[in-house]
Design a protein with these regions (language model features):
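Anionic-ligand-binding alpha/beta catalytic cores of soluble enzymes and soluble regulatory domains
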Residues: 108, 114-126
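Active-site-proximal beta-alpha core segment in soluble small-molecule metabolic enzymes
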Residues: 1-98, 107
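Structured binding elements
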Residues: 101
Length: 126
């Protein structure tokens, strides 16, 4: 982008926790097997770059679960990303504008599956 003298007004960085998150889900697999996303260190360097370039709208994204129906997987991902957003704020004085949890919340496709407990998800995310 710098070579082309292009600096966006908004940017989003994809985070891959790698071995820091032992479990993904059946659809995504384990994070360390994924080809996409940045490590925590790479992402923090990119945030510093974006701040230096005056980019004021910075988001973070992950895709460690998809179509998840169980609260532990969803809440674990939420907690991981909120922790990362807090680290970005504390280390770079940058407030993350948005967090994208990827494929996240699932819907039941089979009769035996229960829908996600949205009230429990909301309470757990507080």
């Amino acid at each position: 982008m710098e070579r082309l003298h292009l600096v966006p007004k908004r940017i989003c960085f994809r985070y891959n926790p790698g071995p820091d998150l032992a479990r993904g889900n059946a659809i995504i697999g384990t994070p360390q097997e994924a080809k996409y996303g940045m490590t925590r260190e790479q992402l923090l360097k990119c945030v510093a770059w974006a701040k230096n370039k005056g980019i004021g709208y910075i988001g973070i994204h992950t895709m460690v679960i998809s179509a998840e129906l169980e609260l532990p997987g969803l809440l674990g991902t939420i907690s991981m990303m909120f922790d990362l957003a807090n680290e970005i704020r504390n280390t770079h004085d940058v407030t993350v504008s948005f967090i994208d949890f990827g494929g996240g919340i699932g819907i039941p496709y089979r009769p035996e599956q229960e829908p996600v407990d949205l009230e429990g998800l909301g309470e757990g995310a507080k």
